[in-house]
């Protein structure tokens, strides 16, 4: 269940990058 939060963090970073574009 440690991979779940890790994926969310990665997704959040990608979302932030897309929002900046």
Swiss-Prot record:
Keywords: Amidation, Neuropeptide, Neurotransmitter, Secreted. GO terms for biological process: chemical synaptic transmission; neuropeptide signaling pathway; regulation of heart rate; regulation of smooth muscle contraction. GO terms for cellular component: extracellular region; synapse. Residues 1-21 are annotated as: Disordered. InterPro entries: Tachy_Neuro_lke_CS (IPR013055). It is found in: Secreted. The modification Methionine amide is found at residue 21. Its main location: secreted. Belongs to the tachykinin family. Tachykinins are active peptides which excite neurons, evoke behavioral responses, and contract (directly or indirectly) many smooth muscles. Is a potent vasoconstrictor and secretagogue that plays a regulatory role in the central control of ventilation, in particular, the heart rate variability (HRV). This is Neuropeptide gamma. It comes from Oncorhynchus mykiss (Rainbow trout).
């Amino acid at each position: 269940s440690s991979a779940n939060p890790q994926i969310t963090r990665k997704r959040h970073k990608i979302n932030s990058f897309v929002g900046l574009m």
